[in-house]
Amino acid sequence: MLKRLLSKCAEGKTLTEEEAYEAMATVMDGAATDSQIASLLSMLCLRGETVDELTGFVRAMRDRMMAIDAGDDVIDTCGTGGDGAATFNISTAAAIVISSLGVKVAKHGNRAVSSKSGSADVLERLGINIQSSPDAAKEALETNGLTFLYAPLYHTAMKHAAGPRKEIGFRTVFNLIGPLANPARCKRQVVGVYSTRYAEKLAETMRRLGSEHVLFVTGRDGLDECSIATETDVVELKDGAIRRFVITPEEVGLPRGELADVQVHNPEESAALLEAVMTVTAPESAVNIVALNAGVALYAAGKTKTIADGVTMAKDAILSNAAYRQLQRLRAKEVVRDA
């Protein structure tokens, strides 16, 4: 089956949704060779993936993940990664802020692959447990309002593609579909995308898969986050409609900042800067970029009617130390201690 589908791709043809499902299922069930996986990923990268293909791939990935029953009122803040900007873990900081405001967050993430610091790396440095069972994850969500879903634990079938992905080295379709396969089956998300040219395709894919409100964001300085230093391109899926717009820091009540203020070299620096944001001892740009991204998430969650209102609410949570108190709660509940 996979040989036939590879031949079809080699002829420049695209796969149907069902063919894409079968191709990804073959990969994730361990029935494809490393050469076949590398060939598929390479051809898709050169040609570009269609919405049918993305939908089939995500369906196959979701069908093989270990899911948790988190209810309908859960949001995720996750990115494709690979933006090369070496920023601290902004989406992780935003997740802590919005969870301090009563919005449940199922943060889906991994260790660093191409970045300086993955969300798992920085949470460990902060003393927050990342490797929990589905039952423990659900309990953390109910008691703390935030749980971290460590991708390798919930997507064990991904191990079959790990070798080829590492060997070829470039971004693949897995960077795009990973954020679309949250084990909590979130219908509301903010997804950072390393290139805005993928955003409409991803939005249409999520529409087909039943998402309610998702914003795909790309800073014009290359961030897979909303940028504090320049404009951010946004593609929004809301109630079945898709629209594109641009947001600037100024229009949501924030001054423009410096990208250098949010860049780090390693997980230790990232954790230190995240904590400094929570204690309001970080550079203003760092505090504001977290407020901006948290504000977008509050809007996606339906907590506010506008992004600007969300930013105001998020910044108040930081300045009032509500976000820092939430960080301390997460440490108290899930701190990792050596035996």
From Swiss-Prot:
Binding-site list for 5-phospho-alpha-D-ribose 1-diphosphate: 79, 82-83, 87, 89-92, 107-115, 119
Entry binding sites for Mg(2+) 1: S91, E225
EC number: 2.4.2.18
A single GO cellular-component term on record: cytosol
Gene Ontology BP term (one): L-tryptophan biosynthetic process
Catalytic activity from the UniProt record: N-(5-phospho-beta-D-ribosyl)anthranilate + diphosphate = 5-phospho-alpha-D-ribose 1-diphosphate + anthranilate
Domain of life: Bacteria
Enzyme class: transferase
Keyword Glycosyltransferase: yes
Function comment: Catalyzes the transfer of the phosphoribosyl group of 5-phosphorylribose-1-pyrophosphate (PRPP) to anthranilate to yield N-(5'-phosphoribosyl)-anthranilate (PRA).
Official protein name in the record: Anthranilate phosphoribosyltransferase
